[in-house]
């Protein structure tokens, strides 16, 4: 298929494979989850790390598994990345994001805390962000026994796609609720709005892996109609007062992604609010390019991982 943007070969293959009907968002949620889980069985290099998991009660929001990932070394970790996974609020798990989380932990020498929040449509907004915020707000109590040496002043919230959306929500909720103190946020191609007629939505509406119709379906699964457009779901609609004082932010977007316009617009709006922003657009790639095992060795993924881990390491010094 001839596309208007030249992609790396591996990204072309992913686009072609994902275009075979039925599309993942046309399946019942459980079947779609299985499709992504199987796709992420693709062999890939996994950085050596130590992983432990526990179920944590988030009060009225229920029990969720939380994974704690540390680099395999003798030196104690001092910094934390609180990572929220993407995949449309409907799909995704620790397995689908394991290679990404392992690399972040190993290359930044951080403890990565990974909540496996309740997914939609079974759990609607704001369940997932409330679960994540509960873990974040109680992070130091939860980790103190096993990791007493953690630095409370270098906390990073991070996420990809809708996980980036929820990472932004964590920063907004922490501002509104008085903590915890978040130093920085790392956002890979984040969802920041529910507007489907942006330039990137129009240009990449289909045939580029993430379809406009797919994003519309994801939003329908996640947001109750009566919820409206709260800024913890649509942060691009936040005013300057709400965005002022947000953490230092890195935003990495892919060129051929329906979400690119809103990700870039959010970075610009943060700058207008006085926030320290580093923004990168990676050419020749598609949505999910840092998450998908099949794209791990592409120039796009390696560039994004080099840039983001270097940024975290620099800011943690």
Label for each model-derived stretch:
Residues 159, 163, 167:
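Gly/Ala-rich beta-loop-alpha elbow adjacent to hydrolase catalytic centers
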Residues 1-71, 228, 299, 317:
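A glycine/proline-hinged amphipathic helix-loop "lid/cap" segment
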Residues 152-154, 168-317:
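Alpha/beta hydrolase fold serine-hydrolase catalytic domain that processes acyl esters and thioesters
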Residues 123-146:
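Alpha/beta-hydrolase active-site loop
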Residues 85-90, 256:
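Active-site glycine-rich loops that stabilize anionic/oxyanionic intermediates
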Residues 95-114:
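Short amphipathic alpha-helix adjacent to the substrate-entry channel of hydrolases
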Residues 141-157:
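Gly/Ser-rich "nucleophile elbow"/oxyanion-hole loop immediately N-terminal to the catalytic nucleophile
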Residues 62-64, 71-80, 243-246:
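Proline/glycine-enriched tight loop/beta-turn segments at coil->beta junctions
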């Amino acid at each position: 298929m001839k596309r208007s943007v030249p992609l790396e070969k591996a990204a072309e293959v992913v686009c072609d494979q994902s275009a075979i009907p039925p599309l993942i968002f046309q399946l019942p949620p459980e079947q779609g989850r299985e499709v992504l889980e199987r796709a992420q069985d693709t062999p890939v290099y996994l950085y050596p790390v130590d992983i432990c998991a526990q179920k944590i009660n988030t009060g009225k929001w229920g029990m969720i598994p939380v994974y704690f990932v540390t680099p395999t070394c003798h030196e104690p970790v001092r910094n934390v990345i609180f990572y929220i996974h993407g995949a449309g609020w409907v799909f995704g798990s620790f397995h689908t994001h394991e290679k990404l989380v392992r690399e972040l932990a190993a290359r930044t020498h951080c403890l990565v805390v990974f909540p496996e929040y309740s997914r939609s449509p079974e759990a609607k907004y704001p369940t997932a962000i409330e679960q994540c915020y509960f873990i974040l707000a109680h992070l130091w109590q939860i980790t103190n026994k096993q990791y007493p040496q953690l630095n409370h002043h270098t906390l990073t919230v991070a996420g990809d796609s809708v996980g980036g959306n929820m990472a932004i929500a964590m920063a907004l909720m922490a501002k509104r609720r008085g903590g915890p103190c978040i130093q920085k946020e790392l956002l890979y191609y984040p969802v920041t709005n529910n507007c489907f007629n942006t330039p990137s939505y129009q240009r990449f509406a289909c045939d580029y892996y993430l379809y406009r119709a797919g994003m519309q379906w994801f939003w329908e699964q996640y947001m109750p109609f009566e919820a409206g457009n709260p800024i913890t779901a649509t942060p691009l609609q936040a005013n300057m007062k709400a965005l002022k004082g947000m953490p230092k932010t890195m935003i990495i977007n892919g060129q051929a992604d329906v979400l690119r316009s809103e990700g870039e617009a959010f970075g610009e709006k943060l700058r207008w609010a006085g926030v320290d922003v580093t923004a990168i657009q990676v050419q020749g790639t598609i949505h999910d390019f840092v998450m998908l095992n099949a794209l791990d060795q592409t120039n796009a993924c390696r560039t994004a991982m080099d840039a983001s881990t270097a940024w975290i390491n620099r800011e943690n010094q």
